[in-house]
């Protein structure tokens, strides 16, 4: 058998037509339309989410845990190796101070409503000036060893100050 685009066919039974229920007793799915007789599940809008048939539901069996700390800081974290790659590719200019806006424009600082924090993974060879909300001890040592500088700026809700 030759294989041609005009001779392609579906496999038998791969496309089963939709069954129209409740269309007369001769179809076998008339009257109650496969829902059985009376009761909650025969009515429209059937299921009750989370209802476990009188058994204690899972969401009530498990304990309430944790809380949201209002004082927690949300930093966008960027590693030194990533910054070096951006400088080498020309997406960051080492002559200008590197801050949250510059890293966001380069596409590496996502989120971080409290600013950006630089971490020490990777190597930095360029002499750069960072203006960031936080920096790790190892990252600060690596930047200063390469001849760069670090200025910590306290920022709250960086997203709101962009406007």
From Swiss-Prot:
Annotated InterPro entries: Ribosomal_uL15, Ribosomal_uL15/eL18, Ribosomal_uL15/eL18_sf, Ribosomal_uL15_bac-type, Ribosomal_uL15_CS
Keywords: Ribonucleoprotein, Ribosomal protein, RNA-binding, rRNA-binding
GO molecular function: rRNA binding; structural constituent of ribosome
Superkingdom in the source lineage: Bacteria
Region (Disordered): 27-46
rRNA-binding among keywords: yes
Any GO BP annotation: translation
GO cellular component, one term: cytosolic large ribosomal subunit
Biased composition (Gly residues): 27-37
Quaternary data: Part of the 50S ribosomal subunit.
Function: Binds to the 23S rRNA.
Similarity remark: Belongs to the universal ribosomal protein uL15 family.
Cross-referenced PANTHER family: 50S RIBOSOMAL PROTEIN L15 (PTHR12934), LARGE RIBOSOMAL SUBUNIT PROTEIN UL15M (PTHR12934:SF11)
Listed name of the protein: Large ribosomal subunit protein uL15
Protein species of origin: Zymomonas mobilis subsp. mobilis (strain ATCC 31821 / ZM4 / CP4)
Upper lineage: Bacteria, Pseudomonadati, Pseudomonadota, Alphaproteobacteria, Sphingomonadales
Gene that this sequence comes from: rplO
């Amino acid at each position: 058998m030759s294989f041609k685009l005009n001779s392609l066919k579906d496999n038998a039974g791969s496309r089963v037509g939709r069954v129209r229920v409740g269309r007369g007793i001769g179809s076998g799915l008339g009257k109650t339309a496969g829902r059985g007789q009376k009761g909650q599940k025969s009515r429209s809008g059937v299921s009750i989410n989370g209802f476990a048939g009188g058994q204690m539901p899972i969401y009530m069996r498990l304990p309430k845990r944790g809380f949201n700390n209002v004082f927690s800081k949300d930093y966008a974290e960027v590693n030194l190796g990533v910054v070096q790659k951006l400088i080498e590719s020309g997406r960051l200019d080492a002559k200008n101070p590197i801050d949250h806006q510059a890293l966001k424009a380069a596409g590496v600082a996502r989120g971080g409503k409290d600013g950006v924090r630089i971490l020490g993974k990777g190597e930095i060879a360029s002499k750069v000036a960072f203006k960031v909300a936080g920096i790790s001890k190892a990252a600060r040592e690596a930047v200063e060893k390469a001849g760069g500088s670090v200025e910590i700026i306290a920022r709250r809700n960086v997203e709101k100050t962009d406007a």
